[in-house]
């Protein structure tokens, strides 16, 4: 982060790659908030965060943060307060940390990423992928309702 700011950037947003509900609108809103706020935080439902927007870097922002815990977002928020920086909070979103999280996300009817859902369902139904990555517990019971998407076996 310090290198990014030293290269002349005056607004930086760090995003996680496991939050499938992050939208371009949220990113746009982040940079709009950074016009008036020093920090923007997008908390995740599991206690982490999916986005951190900054106008300047300070290593103390990450002091005493217990990474991969359920209090990461709260600890960063507390550090922001101790540094007397203004903070905008984004909507809380889910991130994907397990197969169950991915399955639940795929089953949401309100998810707008229909192309991604179709692609992931197709990928999950591929025999090689299922054997390598899908636990046996969910192989047939939960994925069989999507088998209609594939042509019948030859």
Regions flagged by a language model, labelled:
Residues 44, 55, 63:
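Active-site rim beta-loop-alpha module in soluble metabolic enzymes
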């Amino acid at each position: 982060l310090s290198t990014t700011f030293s290269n002349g950037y005056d607004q930086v947003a760090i995003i996680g790659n496991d939050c499938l509900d992050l939208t371009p609108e949220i990113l746009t809103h982040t940079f709009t908030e950074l016009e008036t706020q020093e920090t923007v935080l997008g908390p995740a439902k599991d206690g982490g965060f999916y986005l951190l927007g900054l106008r300047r870097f300070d290593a103390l922002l990450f002091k005493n943060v217990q990474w991969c815990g359920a209090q990461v977002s709260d600890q960063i928020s507390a550090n922001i307060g101790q540094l007397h920086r203004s903070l905008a909070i984004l909507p809380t979103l889910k991130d994907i940390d397990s197969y169950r999280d991915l399955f639940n996300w795929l089953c949401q009817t309100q998810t707008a990423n229909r192309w991604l859902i179709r692609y992931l369902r197709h990928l999950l139904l591929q025999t090689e992928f299922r054997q390598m990555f899908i636990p046996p517990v969910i192989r047939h019971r939960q994925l069989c309702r999507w088998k209609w998407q594939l042509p019948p076996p030859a």
